[in-house]
Amino acid sequence: MQSLFPATRQLLPEIFQRRLDAAETSEAALALLDAGVQDAELLPYLPDLARLEQEAFTCARAAAPPHETTAEIALNPTLCLVPSRWQGLSDLLNGGGGDEQAEPSLAAETVLIWKDPVTAEVRVEPASTNMLLALKIAAEGLSAKEVALDNGLRPLDLQRLLRREVRRGSLIAPASRLVRDPRIVSPDHPWAWPRYARAPIFTLQWHVTQACDLHCRHCYDRSQRGHMPWTDAIAVLDSLDHFCRTHHVQGQITFTGGNPLLHPHFTELYREASARGFILAILGNPCQRKILEDLQAIQPLGGYQISLEGLEEHNDWVRGPGHFQRSLRFLSLLQELEIPSQVMLTLTDRNMDQVLPLARDLHGKVDRFTYNRLSAVGEGASLQLPRPEAYAAFMTEYLRAREEMPFLGIKDNVLNSVCWDENQTVTGGCTGFGCGAAFNFLSLLADGEVHACRKFPSRIGHIAADDLTTIYHSARAKQYRTGPAECLDCRVRPVCGGCLAVSAAAGVDITRDRDPFCLNGPRQEGEEV
């Protein structure tokens, strides 16, 4: 009985400890406690505490639940719900009981007990209303979207609630079906990082319109493309929803353009996307407060990214007079409205020396600052990239600057090779998985063309001809997803793959040749991460 009721036993007088130890069955022990409470000899909550311990003991002896092998989201088979007349008992089982421990109070509570699918540890926690709602959805196979509407929740909030319970282990869920080619990431490869093998989020970068209120000197596409009819736009949302459900990933839409806010029905499109439970973000230009407030009322933005191309004079030469100051005012507005903000810079030979001065000016004004190298296509063909050796020196300087400015992000994948060489932690690079072209990311243009990456011509289909699932699994998409053959043996390939857009603009074979700015050769024999 000492191993079955350790917490309860600690709270018993010595005479009752001996009686508990002498009990032949757990039922006899519980009866002893009930009698002691009735005679006012024991703390009144001890029988309920003992019943929790009994369930936890049974759970600990159960087989470890399956991890990511279920076909649908489901209850952890070891999960049990235990009604209790007392609140605060779980604290006594989870290492509480010190001088600061609050005495359990007489109030009904449901306690959840389960074995974690990953750690095999037994967890004992009081059930909140949201936790019970998530369990009900899984147990009864309910539609999360319908439940969200019935309970006055946003679908995304309910999706997050379900994912939270999956992370905690009270629910089990199928693994993401967005899996890297084993030549890129595999547990069999000692230099690979398994956490980059599966993508939990799929992003559709949707260029909803070509209309733009700027005319930037490095724009990669000024072609005229009409936006799709409303019914087709709704079909896109449904196709993305189906893709995410069947591939067991969270969907995200990053609206961009042009300027996405110039789409004639953008607010309605945003509302429809929210109703399907997607994470929503914007890559756009500064806008008015009222527009942001209206969007926030529908669903808080996951992020708003604007672009700056250097210090004020150079930026306004690229993006137009007054753009720099408008952008600074807009960043203040994003902070005021508590919208996550990001500034993106397109790096050229003209502004490379302005990146860090600009970052210092933005310190405290933006949540994240990143850059990508110029894709010299479209109007960007008139600009130039820096020389590779100059860029290599810059990358080292940039990484060192991150020590004083941790809001500097790594979006250019080749920075990870420098991180590796300088014993710094590598990051997910451009999309969280190195080059994510046609892996955890696709671009949809205003007229329905689907590209692996928007920064260079990489068409893999048309949304009017095929749905996203068909396009994603096409041979052409797989080619972009695999990337250059020269990269496959690289020590940082799981978080790199170079930049296909830069390579394509340089005229190299992107299926064979590595990024012309790459600093690495092939992986050396026996080299490990």
Say what each PLM segment does.
Residues M1-E68, A120-Q205:
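Long, charge-rich, low-complexity alpha-helical segments
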Residues Q54-E100:
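A glycine-rich beta-turn/hairpin centered on an aromatic-Pro dipeptide
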Residues C80-K136:
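Low-complexity, glycine/alanine/valine/leucine- and proline-rich hydrophobic stretches
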Residues L162-D188, F433, A438-T469:
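A broadly conserved sequence feature marking short terminus-proximal activation segments
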Residues P182-D294, G302:
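Conserved alpha-helical substructure of the radical SAM core
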Residues I184-P187, R454-V529:
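Flexible mid-to-C-terminal extensions adjoining Fe-S/redox cofactors in radical SAM and related proteins
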Residues H207-H215, A438, C487-P494:
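Cysteine-centered iron-sulfur cluster-binding motifs in ferredoxin-type domains/subunits
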Residues S223, M228, R276, P300-G303, ...:
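Radical SAM enzyme [4Fe-4S]-AdoMet core and its adjacent flexible, acidic
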